[in-house]
Design a protein with these regions (language model features):
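Basic, flexible Lys/Arg- and Gly-enriched helix-loop patches that mediate nucleic-acid binding at interfaces
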Residues: 1-316
C-alpha cells in the first residue's frame, strides 16, 4: 500500500477529522511504531503500527456508514464516563468492522432524538458537515400551542443569537397523518395536544432550534431530526440502526438534499382536504368544552390570525 500523510490515515480510520487529527499529532497523542509522530509524517497504513492514546487505530480497509434513530436520553458522544448510554451502545456488533472506531457525524442534544449518522470515514463526514456543501437538516418539533402571526414574523426576520442571526430555511405545520406516522416511530409516547411543525436548517449551531423557539416564547417540548440531506427517517424506529445505502452515501458526500424554492418561511395550510383527512384520535388542547362538541377545528396554518399571502409551494 502506498504511503500517505498520517492525518489522512487517521481520518480514514475514523479517529477524527484531518484537522483534528493534526491537533492530536501536535499534542503528542499519536505514535507510529512506538515513536512520537510528527506533523506531515507519511506512513504505510498496511505496515505501520499507529496508536492514539496508546490504543491501535481501526482497520481503514472498510468504511462503514450507519444511520441511527437516536432516542432521547442517549448521549451522542462515543465515550462519556458520566453517561448511562451512548450511541455506540445501540449499534449491533455485526454492523461494526473489526476494531473500527465509529463516531457521529455532528451531534444531537441528549434531550433530542432522531437521525444520527455514524461512520469511520473522516473525509466524507467533513463534507457532510461543511457549510459549503449546504446539507440540510430537517426537524419535527412539538410546542404546546400553535404559533401566532407575530411569532412567525419574528422567525422570518431571524433571531439574534451569540453566533449571529439564526434563520430557518423552511417552516410549516405538519398534517395529522404526518404526525401519526412519526409518533409510531417514537419512544416514549408523545403527550396529547401538542402542535407539530417541520423546520429546516443549514446552520448547525448548538441547540439552535431550542434557542430560536425559546426566544419567541414557544419552547420546544419534543425535537426529532427527520432528515439529513436526502436521507429520511421513513420507518426507522427509535433505537434502531440500518446501514446507509450507496446512493445515500453519494448524495450526502456530494452535498445533496437541498430543497427547491426560496428561503422564506412558508405559510402552509393542511395538505389534505377536510373530507379525506383522517381525524385526530386525541382532542385538541384548545377545544371549547363549554358547549356540546365545541367549535370545529380550523384548518392548520402557521398564520392563523391575519389574512395570508398566496401560498408558496415547497420543493420537498
Amino acid at each position: 500500500m502506498a504511503e500517505e500523510r498520517l492525518q489522512k490515515v487517521l481520518a480514514a480510520a475514523g479517529v477524527a477529522s484531518r484537522r483534528a487529527s493534526e491537533a492530536l499529532i501536535a499534542a503528542g497523542r499519536v505514535r507510529v511504531d512506538g515513536r512520537r509522530a510528527t506533523i506531515g509524517q507519511v506512513v504505510d497504513p498496511a505496515k505501520a503500527k499507529i496508536e492514539v492514546d496508546g490504543l491501535p487505530i481501526g482497520n481503514a480497509s472498510r468504511t462503514t456508514y450507519l444511520l441511527l434513530h437516536k432516542p432521547a436520553g442517549v448521549t451522542s458522544t462515543t465515550q462519556d464516563r458520566h453517561a448511562d448510554t451512548t450511541v455506540l451502545d445501540l449499534v449491533p456488533t455485526a454492523l461494526v468492522p473489526d476494531h473500527a472506531r465509529l463516531y457521529p457525524v455532528g451531534r444531537l442534544d441528549q434531550d433530542s432524538e432522531g437521525l444520527l449518522i455514524l461512520t469511520n470515514d473522516g473525509g466524507w463526514s467533513e463534507k457532510v458537515l461543511h457549510p459549503r456543501f449546504g446539507v440540510e437538516r430537517e426537524y419535527a418539533l412539538a410546542i404546546r400551542t400553535p404559533l401566532s402571526y407575530d411569532q412567525v414574523e419574528a422567525l422570518e426576520r431571524g433571531v439574534e443569537l451569540e453566533e449571529g442571526v439564526a434563520t430557518l430555511q423552511h417552516l410549516r405545520a405538519m398534517t395529522d397523518i404526518e404526525v401519526e406516522r412519526l409518533e409510531d416511530l417514537l419512544y416514549p409516547p408523545v403527550p396529547v395536544g401538542l402542535s407539530w411543525y417541520r423546520a429546516t436548517l443549514r446552520q448547525g449551531w448548538k441547540r439552535q432550534l431550542r434557542r430560536v423557539f425559546g426566544a419567541v416564547e414557544a419552547p420546544i417540548e419534543r425535537l426529532v431530526r427527520v432528515r439529513i440531506g436526502p436521507v429520511r427517517i421513513d420507518g426507522l424506529k427509535s433505537g434502531k440502526v440500518r446501514p446507509l445505502k450507496a446512493p445515500e452515501v453519494r448524495g450526502l458526500g456530494g452535498g445533496g438534499g437541498r430543497s427547491r424554492g426560496d428561503n422564506r418561511i412558508e405559510d402552509v395550510v393542511e395538505v389534505l382536504p377536510e373530507s379525506t383527512a383522517r381525524p385526530r384520535v386525541r382532542p385538541s388542547p384548545r377545544r371549547d368544552t363549554s358547549r356540546p362538541g365545541g367549535p370545529t377545528r380550523p384548518p392548520r396554518s402557521i398564520r392563523p390570525a391575519r389574512p395570508r399571502p398566496p401560498e408558496i409551494v415547497d420543493g420537498d
